[in-house]
């Protein structure tokens, strides 16, 4: 299997339209070839491209910044001497001054397949700026490590944000290249756009469901440590909007959740009693952890770890969004007065609860907080969105 970057590097005919043009690269630490050469270094080494600038998304080109409004500065690359512009610093949309530094921008970002992962919003902002300034956008495509499954509520009109680029469900099942085509169609963006497709991508095939077994995983963001996290993320990311810990400050962030003042054994038992069919496709294991930073720092937490890997993993049956919704529901049923929802500025959104920003509306939170609400009622809200998206996205599937 070859990723888009590898096809571009190997085939001079693919690169031919870039010759004589000023080329920029939007990348992060996971922008590497199969032998772990960073894409910027590999493109520079070709000798036939004029690389004039680089861009970094949230967490930075170097991937050194943590979550939620921890910004990266612009800098000059010390090896190649080109400007590196931050798209998560003073601005999140590229400025006109940034746009005049190139003719074509190559986007080589490893996504996680989740609406809230901000790289897809950065893609949208680049497409819109490129349309305004007459620039070309090429996506060097990479696998969606969460695969093709769809899950979650569609973002409501008026709830767009940096973690909500458009009316898509939480788990969208598209690659970045495919999403670019959807953005262009949905928002009617007049831009010169091209996808350098992968070769041999098989998102519905076991065991990796699009992620090759022999491919080394590199964190695209500091807490995206492995495929298990990528699969669980569409659910565990919701814990960012709660007072319980998502495991930041541990080595398994966004693969587990817990708090010092809950009985995780009781929570798991309640989950199994309330909606056991939402727990399929993975193994849930009770655990203890003590965050070294972030929520509940230095405090022993009782929690649950999600194992969406190994013999217990079932790709189609795994429902991370419903699983995490169920965990919230179990906590609310066991502890009716628990201060569950975290009220703080979240990804530059003020005046809205983070859990609502994450879900693109209040429906999930209202379901959790309603003691009479049933699993069937959440399914009744969510399933039509999932079915509609499955039909809508068909026209944009490249693989």
Where are these regions (language model features)?
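Glycine-rich oxoanion-binding loops at beta->alpha junctions
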Residues: 67-102, 114
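Conserved anion/nucleotide-ligand pocket segment
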Residues: 159-234
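Conserved functional hotspot residues or short segments at active or partner-binding sites
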Residues: 258-379
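N-terminal phosphate-binding or glycine-rich loops at protein starts, especially the Walker A/P-loop
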Residues: 1-49
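Glycine/threonine-rich flexible loop motifs
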Residues: 111-123
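Short internal beta-strands
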Residues: 50-59, 140
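Glycine-rich, aromatic-lined ligand/substrate-binding cores of catalytic
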Residues: 201-297
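Glycine-rich, charge-decorated loop segments at or immediately adjacent to ligand/cofactor-binding or catalytic sites
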Residues: 63-67, 138-160
